[in-house]
Design a protein with these regions (language model features):
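Rossmann-fold NAD(P)-binding glycine/threonine-rich loop
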Residues: 72, 185-188, 192-258
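A short, charged, Gly/Pro-tolerant segment at domain boundaries
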Residues: 252-287
Length: 287
């Protein structure tokens, strides 16, 4: 996707994947700065380290404590989080973004922190469910401190019998369920999340899984319903990163075609929304 975009604007396609152990990351970041890299993307579990290691962080990165993008220039290493742009694009493109909604958020990792930042600006209430409740509570506490936040935040646990009535109510009232965990495995499909009160969900609730691929989404197995995957989010967070690196308008259709080909699906199945690019991480001509 990124190489196709670089080629489309006349630059050499040199976007490469690097697989690293956690212990190798500090040396790699120093090398990237010294060897003239223009930018980097980070996936789990390196998003927190990307925030901590950068010389300059955007406000969104400071709020969430995670970054998925670095821009490297004469200004030094700058950290951004374009996941928020991607999420907003995905929810808007599918007509799922509406003020005053109640949301169930699965997971409390790096992706969930950016998702929470967006949800806090328009949702009425957000229930965060995670196997480590302390991580879920940290997300809630961070969002409640933000001036843009208008949501009520809640953490409930299936393991606590006293939480079950509140869980049932939250699921029954949820307009959206967003799975940020990013794991499509058989073990997860039969794990503790399978015992959540999925039958209580309203039939009108929209379901989103930030992961993508050919394996079934756990959400679809738990609910027996259709689930939107994260391809649209991936496209738009990638386009925002592209513009940060190049200071050029991202060739969104080229990127979509390349992504669709990689995923083996029609390009039309991945909606495009140019207005989402730079919505939260503003830059260049979009300021």
């Amino acid at each position: 996707m990124q190489n196709a975009a670089l080629q489309a604007i006349g630059l050499a396609p040199n976007y490469e994947a690097h697989s690293l152990l956690p212990s190798e990351l500090p040396l790699f970041l120093r090398r990237a700065s010294a060897e003239g890299f223009r930018g980097l993307n980070f996936t789990a579990p390196y998003k927190a380290a990307a925030c901590e290691s950068a010389q300059v962080c955007s406000r969104l990165v400071r709020v969430t404590g995670v970054a998925n993008t670095w821009r490297i220039s004469s200004r030094g290493t700058e950290a951004f989080n374009t996941d928020a742009d991607g999420l907003w694009a995905m929810l808007t493109a599918y007509g799922a973004l509406s003020a005053g909604q109640r949301v169930v958020l699965l997971g409390a990792g790096g992706a969930a922190r950016a998702v929470a930042f967006v949800l806090g600006q328009w949702a009425d209430a957000v229930l965060v469910i995670n196997r480590t409740p302390a991580h879920a509570r940290a997300i809630c506490a961070a969002q409640m401190l933000q001036p843009e936040n208008q949501a009520r935040w809640q953490v409930l646990q299936l393991q606590h019998p006293g939480d079950l009535p509140a869980l049932q109510e939250a699921f029954a009232e949820a307009a959206l369920v967003i799975d940020t965990v990013g794991i499509r495995s058989a073990a997860r499909c039969v794990g503790h999340e399978a015992r959540l009160p999925w039958r209580a969900l309203d039939q009108r609730a929209e379901l989103f899984d930030l992961s993508y691929g050919s394996a079934p989404s756990p959400l679809s197995l738990w609910t027996g319903r259709a689930v939107y995957d994260g391809a649209t989010m991936l496209l738009h967070q990638g386009a925002s990163a592209f513009e940060l690196w190049t200071e050029r308008t991202a060739p969104l259709e080229v990127m979509r075609n390349a992504l669709a080909a990689r995923l083996g699906r029609p390009a039309a199945s991945i909606p495009m929304l140019a207005s989402a690019i730079g919505r939260f991480e503003q830059h260049g001509s979009r300021r």
